[in-house]
Amino acid sequence: MDRNNLMQALYAMDWERIKTELNAGADVNAPYNKHGWTPFMWVCREFYEPEAIKAFLKACGDINSRNQYEEIPFLIAAKHRSSPQTLAVLLKAGADINAQDKFGNTAFVYIVKHPQAMMRLRVLDFMIDNGADPNIKNKHGKTVWNYAAEQDGLTDYLCVRLLEEKSDE
């Protein structure tokens, strides 16, 4: 099985070819570049449909694999505009919502740092509802709160949501 066939199908976003490669036993965990990216990681970055993630998990996608930046598929998906539904599939498969990359950042940090974080409130809600820790410090000593303070209105939103979450416990 030529791993390049799967990557060519992924680059073309040709779902029929992708399914053919998966059914033929393509290795979704084999790194395809010097940065340690796997086809499964690529799908987590580029495909936003939960069904695509499920297909790669069925093909034994490694939920805890890490690239050279120490990113796991969940963190990659969160960084790249994934929906709460896609993130839920990864969490159900065993992803660590608080996993940190080599810079110490979590998925929650990347979502808050996103230039359009206020447009991603559903994803922020998902992270809060699923126990993402806003107090984890990265290698610069910053937390979600530090990055939220840089975005108009985001700190207030997070405070209200986290207080609501705590009052439900």
Regions found by a protein language model. Name each.
Residues T20-D27, K54-D62, A88-D96, D125-D133, ...:
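Ankyrin repeat domain, specifically the short helix-to-loop turn at the C-terminus of the second helix
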